[in-house]
């Protein structure tokens, strides 16, 4: 097992960031409510629901969008005009008023170091062996199958991708879907239904939450990555049984992620696996961010911990991160995969993956496995590992509060204040760095952050340059609260 670094505790930052956070929210909410009170007196139409109609929005969420998100929305949805590689061209936008739609200015694009995308292994490119194979596939297969996989839409590249994916992750068979989100939301209802129990990590992705709701079964949540609480929930659930009847559950399914995308944390798989075996539950792991990014051979969290993949019942992953493509997969025993081919909504009713995208994922996978006859895949994996740990260590030394584990390519940096979401994003753009800032509802209202995504395509020179810029920004807007102290750069 590889050594893991302890996760930073947000509670250790001291009282000042939290105090300023609540002051900022109080100021924003007070001003927003005052403005809307005056607006209602003036008869502003957007503040009144037409007579006889139900409101279209939940009031708090609508207020948040109008009075908070509206002021800082330029920090999101920035269009790019290039390949999403190590460096990207960002198209400038502007609006006359914060509440109005942002429009492209037509000005010169801004060349930025890309620290925001999921291009973990650097396969987002338009040249090289993988890109050449993709271009050739357009002439052979076209870009559209015109049908579902269950009918006549299963292309040769998709079939090959399913076979190679199963071999890569160490399972008997795999099924491929055209969309990562739909892989979870459409698969879970085919796995479990009435009489079953899902026990889900509290920070699981929205696609998993949607899939859980679609099953119609009982869903319980355990504290994030807390194996002790997971066991407590399982024990209590087994003792109580199903609601009202108290009959035994038909099955219990534990759902976790390999790497949690907003926290950068690696799941505590050894302890969770021991609990799964002890209580004879099933285990479903979403490896969207860990497959291709964790472990010496890139085989995800089971590779990272040295666990036999046969011990995991269901492995799910996506091709949208490390592989530079689209879509997702589920890998398991052949009998279960055959069941999904007939029962999963995302397989039966959705179009199959574009052959071109299947070739991209297939060829990237061959490179990672070394089946292209080169050591390019091994070099990419090592570069990603080295880059991630180098960037994490350097930015922590500067005094920033960061989350996550060693070896994770996802490195969240806590901003704490909603005003600093836009400030950090805008200052980074001025310094030619493209970053993703994250706030409510993707994170708790009190924990806004930025999320750096490291890539094998970054050089050490790229990262050193970015660290210098981020260091200056951290001093300018007071972000260095590591261990409860504000640390001025030396």
Swiss-Prot record:
Q: Name one Pfam family in it.
A: Aminotran_1_2
Q: What is its EC number?
A: 2.3.1.50
Q: Where in the cell is it found?
A: Endoplasmic reticulum membrane
Give me the Gene Ontology terms describing cellular component.
Answer: endoplasmic reticulum membrane; serine palmitoyltransferase complex
N6-(pyridoxal phosphate)lysine is found on: 321
Q: Name one GO molecular function term.
A: serine C-palmitoyltransferase activity
**A single BP term in Gene Ontology:** ceramide biosynthetic process
UniProt keyword Acyltransferase, yes or no:
yes
Show the InterPro entries listed in the entry.
Answer: Aminotrans_II_pyridoxalP_BS, Aminotransferase_I/II_large, AON_synthase_class-II, PyrdxlP-dep_Trfase, PyrdxlP-dep_Trfase_major, PyrdxlP-dep_Trfase_small
Task: Provide the transmembrane region boundaries.
Answer: 10-30
Q: Which of UniProt's keywords are assigned here?
A: Acyltransferase, Endoplasmic reticulum, Lipid metabolism, Membrane, Pyridoxal phosphate, Sphingolipid metabolism, Transferase, Transmembrane, Transmembrane helix
Give the way it sits in the membrane.
Single-pass membrane protein
EC top class, in one word? transferase
Q: Which cofactor does it need?
A: pyridoxal 5'-phosphate
**Pathway the protein takes part in:** Lipid metabolism; sphingolipid metabolism
Listed PROSITE patterns: AA_TRANSFER_CLASS_2 (PS00599)
Which reactions does this protein catalyse?
L-serine + hexadecanoyl-CoA + H(+) = 3-oxosphinganine + CO2 + CoA
Q: Does the keyword tRNA processing apply?
A: no
User: How is the subunit organization of this protein annotated in UniProt?
Assistant: Forms a heterodimer with sptA.
Outline what the protein does. Answer: Catalytic subunit of serine palmitoyltransferase (SPT), which catalyzes the committed step in the synthesis of sphingolipids, the condensation of serine with palmitoyl CoA to form the long chain base 3-ketosphinganine.
The UniProt similarity line reads: Belongs to the class-II pyridoxal-phosphate-dependent aminotransferase family.
Query: What is the official name of this protein in its record?
Result: Serine palmitoyltransferase 2
Q: Which organism is it from?
A: Dictyostelium discoideum
The uppermost taxa in this organism's lineage are: Eukaryota, Amoebozoa, Evosea, Eumycetozoa, Dictyostelia
């Amino acid at each position: 097992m590889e050594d893991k670094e302890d996760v930073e505790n947000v509670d250790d930052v001291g009282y000042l960031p939290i105090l300023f956070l609540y002051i900022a929210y109080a100021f924003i909410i007070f001003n927003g409510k005052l403005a809307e009170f005056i607006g209602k007196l003036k008869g502003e139409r957007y503040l009144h629901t037409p007579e006889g109609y139900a409101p279209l929005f939940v009031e708090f969420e609508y207020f948040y969008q109008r009075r908070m998100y509206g002021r800082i929305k330029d920090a999101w949805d920035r269009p790019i005009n290039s390949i999403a590689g190590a460096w990207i061209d960002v198209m400038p936008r502007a609006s006359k008023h914060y509440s109005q739609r942002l429009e492209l200015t037509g000005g010169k694009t801004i060349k930025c170091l890309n620290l925001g995308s999921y291009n973990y292994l650097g396969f987002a490119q338009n040249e090289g062996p993988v890109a050449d194979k993709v271009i050739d596939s357009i002439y052979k297969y076209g870009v559209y199958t015109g049908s579902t996989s269950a009918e006549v839409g299963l292309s040769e590249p998709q079939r090959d991708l399913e076979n190679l994916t199963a071999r890569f992750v160490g399972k008997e068979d795999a099924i491929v879907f055209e969309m990562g989100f739909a892989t979870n939301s459409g698969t879970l209802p085919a796995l479990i239904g009435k009489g079953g129990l899902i026990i889900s990590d509290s920070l699981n992705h929205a696609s998993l939450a949607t899939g859980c709701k679609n099953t119609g079964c009982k869903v319980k949540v355990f504290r994030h990555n807390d194996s002790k609480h997971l066991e407590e929930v399982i024990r209590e659930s087994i003792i109580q049984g199903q609601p009202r009847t108290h009959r035994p559950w038909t099955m219990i399914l534990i759902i976790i992620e390999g790497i949690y995308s907003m926290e950068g944390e690696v799941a505590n798989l050894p302890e969770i696996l021991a609990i799964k075996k002890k209580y004879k539950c099933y285990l479903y792991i979403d490896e969207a961010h860990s497959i291709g990014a964790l472990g010496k051979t890139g085989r995800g969290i089971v590779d990272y911990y040295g666990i036999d993949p046969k011990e995991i019942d269901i492995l799910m992953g996506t091709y949208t991160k490390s592989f530079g493509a689209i879509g997702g997969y589920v890998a398991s025993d052949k009998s279960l995969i055959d069941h999904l081919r007939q029962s999963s909504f995302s397989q039966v009713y959705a179009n199959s993956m574009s052959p071109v995208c299947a070739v991209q994922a297939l060829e990237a996978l061959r490179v990672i496995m070394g089946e292209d006859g080169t050591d390019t895949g091994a070099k990419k994996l090592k570069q990603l590992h080295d880059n991630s740990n180098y960037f994490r260590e350097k930015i922590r030394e500067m005094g920033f509060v960061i989350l996550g584990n060693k070896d994770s390519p996802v490195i969240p940096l806590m901003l704490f204040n909603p005003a600093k979401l836009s400030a950090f994003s805008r200052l980074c753009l001025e310094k030619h760095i493209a970053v993703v800032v994250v706030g409510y509802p993707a994170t708790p209202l009190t924990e806004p952050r930025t999320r750096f995504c490291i890539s094998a395509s970054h050089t050490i020179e790229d990262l050193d340059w970015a660290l210098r810029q981020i260091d200056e920004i951290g001093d300018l807007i007071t972000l260095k609260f590591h261990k409860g102290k504000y640390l001025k750069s030396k």
